[in-house]
Amino acid sequence: PRGLPEGAFCGAGIEQLCLPSDFHNIGPRACENCKSLVEVNLMGTEITALPSSTFAHCVALNCIWLPPRLTLIGKEVSLNCVALQEVVIPTELSDIGNRAFCGCEQLQRFAPLDWGDIEQWVQAEHNAFFMCDKFEKPQWVELLPAEGPDSDAFDEELYHEYPISCQPMVDSRW
């Protein structure tokens, strides 16, 4: 099965990401810091987890369509995606990581295509939606209690944009 390796498009000037059906995985930081990325559509893929920082700091990102078999959204997946307004989720989603949508100031819609499809609770780390000023948590999202000595700590440097030195990878296997 094909997939995007870690940092595949990190810092690249791509505007859209739409992966074909034979993609089964995506690496951490695959599209981190893609300042021009506006839309992500993974609906046709077999991806079951989004690892950490997949789309972090994509400041123009407006909409993400997640794949139907996705069960896990990792930590800081969309950290500081300040333009993100909509995330279309699958009904299989069960876990949302720490600061997954932290700083997504415009986030308003986080839902499946059909509201009737939600059959289970989605567990989210306690600050998964921190600094999402326009977001109202759906009743089917359960925020987990904070754990550990640093669980309530929030590092301002994570929220603010920072320079990332990474080069997009070119791989003929894609």
Give the role of each language-model region.
Residues 1-3, 11-25, 35-49, 59-72, ...:
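Structural signature of tandem-repeat unit edges
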